[in-house]
Every structure is written in C-alpha cells, then in structure tokens.
Amino acid sequence: MKQNPLINTNTILQRNPDQLFTMIGDEIVMLDIKHEEYLNMNRHASYIWQQLVTPLTFGELTDHLCSAFDVEKKVCIQDTLDFIAEFIERDIIQIIRE
C-alpha cells in the first residue's frame, strides 16, 4: 500500500464533500468518480468515513478507532495510514492542513 509522507498525528483530514455514497446496513458503498468504480467499504472503513464528517486530526482519528475496535495502537496507525493514503490518492479524503 502507498503511504503519504505528509500525514502525521497533527494532519487534519476530512472527507471530500462532493463524494457520492450510500449506507447499506452498517457499510458504505460509494462511487469513485475519478477511477469510475464502486467501492464497498467494510465496517472499519465505514467507521473512518463517518468520523470524517467533520475534520479530525490523524491522531484523533486513530484514537477513536482504538477506542471503538479492539486493536493495538501501532497496528491501528499503520492500517489507517494505508487506508487514508489510498483514499487521498483517489480524492475521497482530503488533507485540510498538515
């Protein structure tokens, strides 16, 4: 997975307000317009998407994830970095301020 060297604990993230998505149960399906494909987000990815309805720092986001799911902090940070980097590349999640 790609990683964005610009992301640190103080990086402020938000979801792209123009992104089209819908809830199906507790998961999200969205249309990635840039790559012309549908994405089915699992419950962890859906949780991240829901948290980013308002801007959060990467550190706040990983704190929320560690509280919501039984995961070690180090694993959470790495997995979340991978996910965020991919979604930044797809312009689904945006960096507001580094």
Residue positions per predicted region:
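Long, charge-rich, low-complexity alpha-helical segments
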Residues: 24, 37-98
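Acidic, low-complexity/disordered tracts enriched in E/D and polar residues
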Residues: 1-46, 50, 96
